[in-house]
Amino acid sequence: SILRYLFVTLQSEEYKNKMKTVINSYDEFASYLGKPLGTSEWLEVDQDRINAFADATLDHQWIHVDVERAKAESPYKSTIAHGYLTLALLPHLWDEIVEVNNLKMMVNYGMDKMRFGQPVITGSRIRMTAKLGNIENLRGICKAYIDFTIEIEGQRKPALKGEAQFLYYFK
């Protein structure tokens, strides 16, 4: 029946992962302290994205951009994404997890405890999981400490783990 289908769908991990966490105030944000905020969609890291990042950052190391040499000489038998490309995708992946409303603005504050676990091989798909590790009210400014993990599809070890810090200026 349609009700059973809806019930099963709404309980599935895939459906839950597609739902954004919506936050409208500091108090709502604080209510997630220590709790998971969600999981982004999978995102493919292809050679075009890697080449564009290499051009933007002037980092054209062969392990990232020389497909033929990587096939012949790299232990991965493929090019790999720049570690900082994986990090640079964090804002996009974060936006897929959380929607923060009633803002004047949001500012990236910093990163802590960042570790690259393993390289992202070209053509791999990544996604991010996040939870609120800490939160502070700094005279009306919300400082959120987000514990994140960027995982690689089919791999046990993550590509990147760390703590992102954002300042949210609520209206």
Predicted regions span which residues?
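Hot-dog-fold acyl-thioester-processing enzymes
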Residues: 19-108
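N-terminal amphipathic/basic-hydrophobic helices that include classical n-h-c signal peptides
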Residues: 1-18
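Short alpha-helix capping/helix-loop boundary micro-motifs
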Residues: 111-116
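HotDog/MaoC-like acyl-thioester-processing domains
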Residues: 18-32, 120-171
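Alpha-helix capping at helix-to-loop junctions
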Residues: 95-99, 119, 135
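Generic alpha-helix initiation/capping and coil-helix boundary signal
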Residues: 1-2, 47, 157
